[in-house]
Amino acid sequence: MTIMRKSHPLMKIVNHDFIDLPTPPNISGWWNFGSLLGLCLILQIFTGLFLAMHYTSDTLTAFSSVTHICRDVNYGWLIRYMHANGASLFFMCLYIHIGRGIYYGSYLYTETWNIGILLLFLTMATAFMGYVLPWGQMSFWGATVITNLLSAMPYIGQDLVEWIWGGFSVDKATLTRFFALHFITPFIITAMIMVHLLFLHETGSNNPLGLPSNCGKVPFHPYYTTKDFMGVILLLTLFMTLVLFFPDKLGDPDNYTPANPLNTPPHIKPEWYFLFAYAILRSIPNKLGGVMALAFSILVLALLPYLHTSKQRSLSFRPLSQTLFWMLVSDVIALTWIGGLPVESPYIMIGQVASVLYFSIILIFMPIAGLIENKMLKL
């Protein structure tokens, strides 16, 4: 008699993807972040669902409804802080996941990689809309500044901005539609993740060596379920430490002031996970140029499969490319730091240098390093 997990139509899908999935025997802890992202998404959907039960998407009551959640709802403060810090955790895992993909050459699975970039855009849009919902000072002004960037688009820019706003400024219509979209996008992300996994399981996982491992694959369960569970325990420990001891560490104090269109905060900035892109946007004096650089800072990832010049897939045995990779990581950290600082000297110059370096490493230096390494290794 066949085992139920191998014969039942629904169980067969689960079995194929999470139990009997052939997996390379040597994948390291850097491969844990895919499953951790799944955990973060589940956390965000459930905490968001409970918050939506008490939240009101009206400009007059949005701020006080968030206060009501924290003060009057049973464990409302915990749900609210889990949701707010869960977004930070999500992006931390997401950036590590992308970094691992770049380091080990996972971008050569082009379909999986491109779906991943689409997922990144969707996640960024979801997080941005969520940041607007508490209707604090930074929520309101962040929404005004970031949506207003679309007006830089020739011909249709101003009409597009007014269409998104639902009027001539960020107001009740904007808040209502942002709430509706913020609620639905996680489910679109979930569907896209299914497609992401579908393409990944067509090719199989990459490994640290970047070599085919078909001859030595092992089943996903129990080896990697145990390994992933260890990652889950560590992540939840870090997460609950942040939520229970430092809940406001990653937030902005200005967001504890209700939105006031007549009073502009001294320094408008998005959440920390958007600061690197915000720094690139600010480093170009021209509005349209800045918006294009902002979009291209993410879209440049889609060019990686076509800029791969090395005969080796992974960076494991390529010291020159490794150096450039860690320079890129340092540069993104520097951009994140600069994005949170005021627009004044010397920060403007540092931001411009870091922005040029960001694109130069990806578009020029890494492809050249690949060719040099081929030459040195006589490949």
Swiss-Prot record:
Cross-referenced PROSITE patterns: CYTB_CTER, CYTB_NTER
Residue positions binding heme b b566: H97, H196
GO molecular function: metal ion binding; ubiquinol-cytochrome-c reductase activity
InterPro entries: Cyt_b/b6_C, Cyt_b/b6_C_sf, Cyt_b/b6_N, Cytb/b6-like_sf, Cytochrome_b, Cytochrome_b_C_euk/bac, Cytochrome_b_N_euk/bac, Di-haem_cyt_TM
Gene name in the database record: MT-CYB
Chief location of this protein within or outside the cell: mitochondrion
Coiled-coil spans in chain: none
Binding site for heme b b562: H83, H182
Domain of life, per lineage: Eukaryota
Name of this chain's protein: Cytochrome b
Binding site for a ubiquinone: H201
